[in-house]
Design a protein with these regions (language model features):
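Intrinsically disordered, low-complexity segments enriched in small/polar residues
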Residues: 11-12, 17, 38, 57, ...
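Extracytoplasmic electrostatic interaction patches
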Residues: 104-168
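Short, ordered beta-strand-loop transition motifs
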Residues: 31-35, 88-91, 101-102, 140-144
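Mature extracytoplasmic domains of secretory-pathway proteins
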Residues: 60-128
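N-terminal export/targeting and maturation segments
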Residues: 18-77, 160-162
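Bacterial Sec-dependent N-terminal signal peptides
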Residues: 1-23
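Ser/Thr- (and often Asn-) enriched beta-sheet segments in non-cytosolic proteins
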Residues: 23-28, 39, 43, 61-63, ...
Length: 168
C-alpha cells in the first residue's frame, strides 16, 4: 500500500509539473539604500516559451532583515521598479521597459532557448545581469537617484560590459 501511495504521489507531482509555469532569473536590481534586491524572472510555459500574457515576475528578496525572504512588490514599489512589456508577434519577443531605467528600452526573448533581457550598454547589445542604483534620501524621505550602473555581457562575445548613467 505504501508503494502504491508513493507511486501515485510521484506521478501526480510529475503531471502537475508538466503544466506548471517555470521561472528563470533574468537580472536583479541592487540598491545603495540597503541589502534588499529586486529580482526579475522570466515566466516560461510548459512548452519552454515565454508566457505571452505574464512574461515577467518581479519581487523583493529581503536580505536587510529577513534573510532573503521573498516579498511581492507593492503598488508604491511598482512605480519605481515596475515594468511594461509589449509582445511582438512577428519577432516572437517582447519590447520591455523597466521604470527604474526607462530611458534604456530592452528586448526580452529566448536566446538558445534561455530567456534573456537585451539592453544597450556602451551602445553594445548585452544580456543584462544587474542594475545598481545609487540614491540619496530626498524630500519626504523619498529616495532621489544619483546614478545607476548597468552590468551585462555582450550578446556576440560574452565579454563583460558596465556603464554608469548619471540621472539629472
Amino acid at each position: 500500500m505504501k508503494k502504491v501511495f508513493t507511486f501515485c504521489f510521484l506521478f501526480l507531482y510529475y503531471v502537475v509539473s508538466l503544466y506548471a509555469d517555470k521561472t528563470i532569473n533574468l537580472f536583479v536590481i541592487e540598491r545603495s539604500k540597503n541589502a534588499n534586491i529586486v529580482k526579475y524572472d522570466a515566466i516560461l510555459t510548459n512548452t519552454g516559451k515565454i508566457n505571452e500574457k505574464n512574461p515577467i515576475d518581479a519581487y523583493w528578496l529581503l536580505y536587510a532583515k529577513k534573510n532573503g525572504e521573498r516579498e511581492e512588490l507593492s503598488s508604491f514599489d511598482k512605480k519605481a521598479y515596475g515594468f511594461k512589456t509589449n509582445y511582438n508577434k512577428e519577432k516572437d519577443n517582447f519590447d520591455f521597459v523597466l521604470k527604474a531605467v526607462k530611458d534604456k528600452p530592452m528586448i526580452l526573448g529566448l536566446y538558445n532557448n534561455v530567456p534573456k533581457a537585451v539592453i544597450k550598454i556602451n551602445n553594445i547589445d548585452c544580456f543584462l545581469e544587474k542594475v545598481y542604483i545609487e540614491s540619496k534620501d530626498g524630500a519626504l524621505g523619498i529616495p532621489k537617484v544619483s546614478y545607476y550602473e548597468l552590468f551585462g555581457k555582450e550578446v556576440s562575445t560574452g565579454k563583460a560590459q558596465q556603464q554608469e548613467i548619471l540621472v539629472k
